[in-house]
Each structure stands twice: as C-alpha cells, then as structure tokens.
Amino acid sequence: MNKLSTKLVVAIGIGAALYGILGLWGFSIAPNTFIKPALAILTVFGALFGPVAGLLIGLIGHTVTDTIAGWGIWWGWVISSGIIGFAMGLIQKRVGFSVKNGTYNKGDISYLAITGLIGIVIAIIFAGAFDIIVMGEPFDKIVIQVLGATIADVIVFLVLGLPITIGLAKSNKKHTQLKIEK
C-alpha cells in the first residue's frame, strides 16, 4: 500500500471536518432526508486529491456529522458518503486532468459528471439496502428516502459540486501561462 503524504492526510482532515460540519445543515425533502450542500465538498476534494481522499473524507466526515447530531451513526449512509467521495475522486486518475493545474477538457468534465452520477446512485441504493437488511428499516420508508436522497444529491452535485470544481480548474488555468522573469 502506498504511504499517504502529509499533504494528503491534511487534505483529508480538512475535507472531513468541512464535510462533517456542513453536513449538519440542509433542507428537509423527505423523512430523514435532506438536500445537503456539503456534498459539494466531496466533489471538490475528490477531484483535487483523488479517490482515496474522497473515500476517507466521506467516511470520516459523515461519521462526524452523525456523532455531533446525536442521532447515532447510520453506517449504511456513512459508507454511501465514502462511495460518493471515491466516485468523485476517480476523475483524478484521468491522464491530463488536474484541478490544481487547470488542465482539463470536455471529456474530463463528462467523465466527472458520469462517474459522479453513477457513484451517487450506487451509494444511495447501497445505503437503502443496508438500512432494510441490516437495520430492519421498513421498505416503504427507505424507498422514499432513497428517491429523495438520490434527487437531492444529484441536484447538489450538478448545481454546486460540478460547477465549483470546473470553476476552480478554470481559475487555475488562467495562471498556467505565467512565467517567472529573471
């Protein structure tokens, strides 16, 4: 296994703290289901630092949210946040893509959009199945939660996460042409 660099560990810590604290805030759309802008953190940090960082930020951050909120840790949803973060970080594996350097193309943006959407759907279905099978939650309730959470996460991803990530890459692209004068 590769060692985690100090920079990556710090990024995971900051990302998890931001995701954990911002995860306490949201707009209710279904029973125990919220539109949470914090999901944008997973998109941005995943794109910046890769799938391992995205996974750990999702896992740790969601655990922080559940712990602070006091409703107990819902492991299916914690794992789903990790899955989403991992999916968002897959863009980092594309050759030539870098938010930090502002290097990307339309194919990269499409890849991030597709892997992000697929990751959200897989993660939320996993969380719902986990709640039914392991936690003994009623099927009808979970169907509503899964539909609500999927819609909410897709909205946040498309309205906040993706545009912020593209904006960061664009702003960094402007600086790639700068040269140091002697």
UniProtKB/Swiss-Prot annotation:
It holds the Pfam family ECF-ribofla_trS. It is found in: Cell membrane. InterPro entries: ECF_substrate-spec-like (IPR009825), UPF0397 (IPR022914). Keywords: Cell membrane, Membrane, Transmembrane, Transmembrane helix. Disulfide bonds: none annotated. Signal peptide: none annotated. The chain crosses the membrane at residues 9-29, 40-60, 71-91, 114-134, 142-162. Its main location: membrane. GO terms for cellular component: plasma membrane. It is a multi-pass membrane protein. The keyword Transmembrane helix applies. Belongs to the UPF0397 family. PANTHER family: UPF0397 PROTEIN BC_2624-RELATED, UPF0397 PROTEIN SPR0429. This is UPF0397 protein BALH_2375. It comes from Bacillus thuringiensis (strain Al Hakam).
